[in-house]
Each structure stands twice: as C-alpha cells, then as structure tokens.
Amino acid sequence: MPTQHTFSRELRLLTPEHFKRVFAEPVRAASPQITLLACPNTLEHPRLGLAVPKKALKRAVWRNRVKRVVRESFRLNQANLPAIDIVVIAKAGVKEMDNEELFKLLEKLWRTLSRRCNG
C-alpha cells in the first residue's frame, strides 16, 4: 500500500459482512462521544466503517460533519494503524464538540486502538 494519504474504496468497509465481523469480537477504544471497534483483517492496510445513527445526531448536517472529520482523521493517521477493520460509532455528545476537539479525540483513540491491537 502506498504511503500517500488517500481514502480510496479499498480503505472502506463496504458490506454488511465486514461490519458483522467487527461487531462479533471487537477490540474497543471509547470515549463518552465516540466508540471505536476493531478486529484484525487479512489485508496489508486498515479499513474504516462509519456508524452515525440518526437517534444520536438528528440533523443530517451534524451526521455529515462527524463523518467528514472522522474520514479526514483516518486518512491522515492510516499509516500509523495496523491491518485492522475499524467501525466508528458516534454518540450524542459528539454534536457538542467542535472539529478541532473531535480531531484530537480521534487521534487519541487511534493511538489507543493501535496499542491494543498490536500488543
């Protein structure tokens, strides 16, 4: 996998089976606003799936903002992550955070998840 910072199709979880595998036996990293679930994959790179429920974030603009920030954070940190499938679940509290706070929280959670999956 090239070290360029892109977010192409092969870096995403696309099918329900991919998501089910992660939900079956996950390694967790969580905060009150966001939960990250992960499980090892057989590829050479990490993949990302997003779960931003309407129940937690009622307005589409709120959901889209969270997804945009999560994708950007993943794109910039993917080189530091092991070969794992990750599902990011947003909770209601994430709406109160600004983009910078959310970005810092995600970086901390990526590091935690990476440590737990490697060791």
From Swiss-Prot:
Pfam annotation, one family: Ribonuclease_P
GO molecular function: 3'-tRNA processing endoribonuclease activity; ribonuclease P activity; tRNA binding
Function, in words: RNaseP catalyzes the removal of the 5'-leader sequence from pre-tRNA to produce the mature 5'-terminus. It can also cleave other RNA substrates such as 4.5S RNA. The protein component plays an auxiliary but essential role in vivo by binding to the 5'-leader sequence and broadening the substrate specificity of the ribozyme.
Protein name (record): Ribonuclease P protein component
Keywords: Endonuclease, Hydrolase, Nuclease, RNA-binding, tRNA processing
Sequence similarity: Belongs to the RnpA family.
GO cellular component, one term: ribonuclease P complex
Assembly and interaction partners: Consists of a catalytic RNA component (M1 or rnpB) and a protein subunit.
Enzyme Commission number(s) of this protein: 3.1.26.5
Top enzyme category: hydrolase
